[in-house]
């Protein structure tokens, strides 16, 4: 089944970006992936109303996932944003920048795809209801 939702994946690790893109396309989503967060942001500025969900890594060169999310929020406040990290999630929740970015979900790496699929369905179903 093809989903009406489009997902933007941003991870500086080529293998992970490719893995996420392949998995999500197999779930029926239209997926665009970037390994450079600056290019992803430039692309998003041009296509801000196309994507329902952004999945981004936390630690990347040139711009971190939180700063990317804050920039995206200024462009489109309704898009859902998932932030992935291999580091301790607890430390993020009290971070002021994290709060300003209004992250919808935190994903602990390695990400289990069955959990990811459930989180995506829950988040995008909310969009369908609104």
Predicted feature residues:
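Alpha4 helix (beta4-alpha4-beta5 surface) of REC/receiver domains from two-component response regulators
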Residues: 67, 88-105, 118
